Design a protein with these regions (language model features):
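N-terminal beta1-alpha1-beta2 module of alpha/beta enzyme domains
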Residues: 1-88, 189, 386-388
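Hydrophobic faces of well-ordered beta-strands that scaffold small-molecule active sites
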Residues: 3-7, 58-60, 90-93, 121-125, ...
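An alpha-helical appendage that flanks or caps ligand/catalytic pockets
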Residues: 4-32, 144-180, 220-341, 377-388
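Active-site mouth loops of central-metabolism enzymes
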Residues: 28-41, 94-104, 185-196, 252-253, ...
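Acidic (Asp/Glu)-rich catalytic clusters
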Residues: 52-53, 78-87, 110, 114-121, ...
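Glycine-rich, proline-tolerant flexible connector loops at the mouths of alpha/beta enzymes
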Residues: 59-77, 97, 129-131, 215-216, ...
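Conserved, mostly hydrophobic/aromatic
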Residues: 62, 81, 113, 154, ...
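A conserved active-site cap/scaffold subdomain adjacent to cofactor or substrate pockets
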Residues: 196-220, 224-225
Length: 388
């Protein structure tokens, strides 16, 4: 198993919740202090560099118009890290290509980072979350189709080396595509795609790409992983599904004592609790399928708060959303989850969120790297999983 240190680069200094309608899209940026923002950027970059020193890989994402993720350009942050880190793989999960007007620009940016990092880039694609439809001035309908067409154009741009080509799709039309530079890794960097549903997992598996899923816990993760395994085999990729093709993201804090570990886990709950979002941003018409809307009405939305909901640490640990405690306790929690979902090869560890201090973040990273990671690396040897 590989561990990827992940932070959404949040700005936690928010007004009282009654003072704003939504934490995303419409919160006025007068609440943002650039001087504090500068310090937060320095701390997050230092933590990613420290993860690199500890032998942990790095994950970056991007979101827009929200204090919960003040990283609106994953390529910029990853370009910085390509220069200041030495060994870590650099995963962008991901580029919201359904909302990008110029997929060729994404192909160029990713190729440039891959060269700058000497082939350490892992490139993820996402269709974007619902609330970003409005700030992207994007059509909420057929976003999945737009994402895959943008993917096709990017892949062709990466792998065409004989001069310009023309691309005529349903959503994207480009003439004279001929990117410089081309990727360091040939034919292209490893590709990841996110999935929170079995349908998305099936599409990803058919292409043989890596899948990342977030905060699904014990209940929602097994169906996603099992759908991937089934489709992977049916696509003829082989009977054994590589563990390295599956990734899970949870909130993780490792302390010296159980009390310290739980205190850190409690701090990470900020990410779940500060998520006030009105329905017109949460679920724009046409974005979600009928089945997804039925699940939402049943309370099955992932990562979106119910009004008045205050997360309880023990409940979130029992769900497989938060993993915290001593090194032994965190390993046991992760091992139990690993066995329950049938195994996975990438732990996308959200080890920093909200008011968790820079010092505590680094302390947790140290325990994770030195006392938990060596045991996690032993899981799943040999590196494939049997039939689900």
């Amino acid at each position: 198993m590989r561990i990827w240190h992940f932070s959404e680069t949040a700005y936690p200094h928010l007004p009282a919740e009654d003072d704003y309608e939504s934490v995303r899209v419409s919160m006025p940026n007068r609440y943002y202090d650039p001087k504090i923002g500068y310090e937060l950027y320095q701390n997050r970059i230092d933590e990613w560099c420290y993860a690199d020193e500890l032998g942990i890989d790095i994950m970056i994402n991007e979101h827009h118009q929200t204090p919960t993720c003040v990283d609106p350009s994953a390529p910029i942050m990853t370009g910085v890290l390509a220069r200041v880190t030495k060994n870590a793989r650099l995963l962008i999960l991901g580029n919201p290509i359904a909302n990008r007007r110029q997929p060729v620009r994404v192909a160029e940016e990713m190729a440039m980072i891959d060269v700058m990092s000497k082939g350490r880039l892992e490139c993820g694609f996402v269709r974007s979350v619902p609330y970003e439809i409005a700030p992207a001035n994007s059509n909420p309908v057929r976003t999945t189709e737009r994402m895959w067409e943008a993917h096709d154009l990017i892949l062709k741009a990466w792998t065409t080396h004989d001069g310009p080509f023309t691309f005529e799709g349903e959503f994207f039309h480009h003439r004279m595509v001929n990117i410089w530079p081309r990727p360091y890794q040939q034919p292209h960097p490893p590709i990841w795609v996110t999935a929170l549903s079995t349908g998305n997992a099936t599409d990803i598996a058919r292409k043989g790409y890596k899948l990342g899923t977030f905060l699904g816990g014990y209940e929602k993760t097994p169906p996603v992983f099992n759908a991937y395994r089934k489709a992977y085999r049916e696509a003829g990729h082989g009977d054994e599904v590589p563990l390295e093709n599956l990734g899970y993201s949870g909130l993780i804090f490792v302390g010296e004592t159980e009390e310290e570990g739980r205190a850190g886990g409690q701090q990470l709950l900020w990410y779940l609790s500060h998520n006030k979002l009105p329905m017109h941003f949460k679920n724009p018409p046409g974005y979600a399928s009928i089945d997804a809307n039925v699940m939402a009405l049943k309370g099955a939305q992932i990562g979106v708060r119910r009004e008045g909901w205050v997360p309880d640490l023990d409940e979130e640990m029992a769900k497989g959303i938060v993993f915290c405690g001593t090194p032994d306790q965190v390993f046991d929690q992760l091992k139990k989850f690993y066995d329950h979902v049938g195994g996975f090869g990438n732990l996308l560890s959200m080890g920093q969120a909200g008011h968790l201090s820079h010092e505590d973040t680094k302390k947790s990273l140290t325990f994770l790297a030195k006392e938990v990671y060596p045991r996690l690396k032993e899981l799943g040897k040999p590196t494939s999983i049997a039939a689900a």
